[in-house]
Amino acid sequence: IAQCLVGSEMCIRDSHKGVDVDIVSPVEPDEIPAALARHVARRTAGRDVHVCVGPSRDELEVLIDKADVVVDAIFGTGFHGNLRAPFSIWIPTVNECADCVVSIDVPSGLNAETGVVDDDCIRAEHTVTMIAPKIGLYSADGPEYAGDLICGNLYDRLDEVIDDVDHAAEIVEPGDLVDYFAPLPTNIDKYSRGSVLIVAGSAQYPGAAIMAAKSAARAGAGYVAVAAPDACANLIRMALPSIPVFAIPSDSRGSFGAAARMTVCEIAKKYSCVLCGPGMTTSAGAMQVVSGLLELDVPLILDADALNCLAKIAIDGIDSNPEMYRREQPLVMTPHYRELSRLVAGDEVNDLGTAIAAAQKVVWAAGSDNLVVIAKGPTTAICGVERVLLPLSGPASLATAGSGDVLAGILAGTLATMRDEMDRWELLYSYAVALHSYAGFAAATEYGEKSVIATDLIDLIGPAMELAAKDALEDLGIMNEGSDD
């Protein structure tokens, strides 16, 4: 079903190969407005190719019924807005009747820049996108409609061209992460594996600290400890027998109290990495803890309520107060869309494109190579000063309470154990996000997509590492499926 140049040219090539091709077009070849597309369409009509112009719904159903594959080449990357006839009839018909649909560049009806579907859209089994993936295929409705993505190389020197062109983001392939799967050396001890302090929890949310701490340990940290309000410290101790818990003075509501800042900061100096935020609330004491940790000379991850504390401190947006978070040591912020919107004082963040833009405001304001914002969403973006990376996206089952606490713990364990990766922070964090995604796939397989809860992910971090390592080796052609090596 074509009204674009690529669709018509594809029909010519397929007919040369003996493939029985029917073309569905809204107009006669001579009526196509674009000169090059009109020329190709005329060539197509001159071949032994059946062209059906403006079929009714019933006529289209007959054509689809006899087709093994329907190629969707209706709209290109410039489409936006609402569908008009006949496409508002054809697209639902294809979705209802076709067994296999392959879309060219983007599924017709999808906005290639935002990933938004306003009316209806082709649901493709595969999308062959030309030259480079489009951001809309990863944003908003894009993943639901695009199916499996294949990038078509239209130019022999494409890599050289792409390197010279500004691009929104880079896709992280499994093989890019292969260096992170090296086995532990035999002479290692728990401290040289990296130590993590989890500053988290409250009487209302003790589970967040528990999940983050267990995840950091599963991700490889040799020594993990928790600093939590004394109102919930004993509960956390009972849940984590292998992890020390520091009881920090709390306020009347069971959150960090006024004396917490000095105590937490003194403890934090001894650790390879500090994770602050899960379940800690935004009490006055919690806000002081966040401010104090930002001043310390230690790698820091700010998650959940730590980010909400930042947003409350800088009511006009943290990008207007970069001195507050500009530091020498690594700083990672892990906001989801709503948290990110609060960090930039209410800028609308509702899809991948707006999330990247908001994250870049924060990063560029500080201008530090050590600051990375991980904008969490259906497709998570790792945003640094010079590059934006898109690691493997997880299943929908990861959209569950506590999943972010698990990811924060994985990030902390990863940062603590691999601090020598200072020249490529974004890729290191992509590895951590990918592990979280692999754990999500493993949990969905084990428990069913709708039944996954956050604690299911933690014990699957180890198997997730094995899956990720296998995919990395296969992506590089080092190990074939079924190999014993």
Describe each model-derived feature in a short phrase.
Residues 8-9, 13-36, 64, 69, ...:
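Small-residue (G/A/S/T)-rich helix-start motifs and N-terminal tracts that mark the onset
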Residues 1-7:
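Positively charged, low-complexity/disordered segments
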Residues 41-49, 76, 243-250, 396:
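Short, structured secondary-structure boundary patches
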Residues 47-52, 78-83, 250-255, 277-280:
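Short, flexible loop segments at the rims of nucleotide/cofactor-binding pockets, characterized by
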Residues 55-58, 108-112, 135-136, 306-309:
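Short acidic loop-to-helix transition motifs that present clustered carboxylates
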Residues 1, 60, 264:
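Acidic, amphipathic alpha-helical patches
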Residues 68-69, 74-167:
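Internal gly/pro-rich beta-alpha loop/helix module
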Residues 8-9, 13-74, 82-104, 288-289:
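Nucleotide and nucleotide-moiety/phosphate-recognizing core
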